[in-house]
Amino acid sequence: MVPYPPGTEPDILARDLGVHLNKATGKVFVIENRPGANAIIGTDNIAKAKGDGSALLMVDSLAVSTNPLLYSNLPYKWEKDLKPVTTVAGVNLYLLVRNDFPAKDYKEFIAQAKKANGDTNVGTGGRGHVTHLGMGLLAREEGVNFTYIPYKGMAPATNAILGGETDAMLVGGILASQHVDGGKIRVLAVGADKRTELLPNVPTVQEAGGHANSIPTTTFALFAPGTTPDDTVKEIQEKVDAALKKLTSELETVPPDSFNELVGRVATEGN
């Protein structure tokens, strides 16, 4: 289950992973997209599914842990109804601006945003989406104000900046690399400790003169229904780990115990 539209980064990762799991296990893994409500619709579907190892959720782990802070009437309780399996990929976020935005680099972008005093329009994948929270973090760290424009997913948000409707946004590397040569956007910085192989000409936010923590990273992860036995979760994690080693992307998995601690810590810090 992918609670995002087709063509988004978690969808692409899930489909790549599914191909390798099909080969490794001989079982057919079907990718189902149920986007909406900042991943709540698809997440609820898995929260209520049978815990027999046949249903998994590929989701931004921040959405799981921060949605309870943003929405008071969630149809599930993630601590009880979902069980962390493993991370699939840590994803760097890149700051994009429309090509004609009057700033040639990150420092000028911040200066322009301060001068605009809230009139810089920032597109996001929706209320509470990691791109919304990420731009909020950037605003706090750099002391600027933005006008946030939520869209129903990353596809319309990306189309908006390509069409000049918004000034800036955060995206993952796959989306950034798809559009960087089109002449309609520019990539100013990446939230990473070092430059990435995907876009080596893009400086880190610290290299670009910003605060080191201004642009966060995110993690796409697998969850199982909360009733899934621990030994089944461990078996799934081992198969996923083996499948990930065959992918060409730089991915890192985390064992279920430490991943559970990670998700819990994110929620605690959010509170």
Residue spans of the language-model regions?
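Extracytoplasmic "Venus flytrap"
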Residues: 1-14, 36-38, 123-130
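Short, well-ordered beta-strand elements
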Residues: 1-5, 29-30, 55-58, 83, ...
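Hydrophobic residues within well-ordered alpha-helices
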Residues: 7, 46-47, 135, 161-162, ...
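Short, polar/charged alpha-helical segment
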Residues: 7-26, 132-140, 179, 241
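Hinge/capping helix and adjacent helix->loop/strand transition within the periplasmic-binding protein
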Residues: 21, 48-54, 69-156, 168, ...
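Short helix-initiation/N-cap motifs at beta->coil->alpha
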Residues: 34-42, 91, 126-127, 149-159, ...
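A ligand-binding cleft/hinge motif common to bilobed small-molecule-binding domains
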Residues: 62-73, 137-141, 168-202
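C-terminal lobe and pocket-closing loops
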Residues: 104, 176-250, 254-257, 265-271
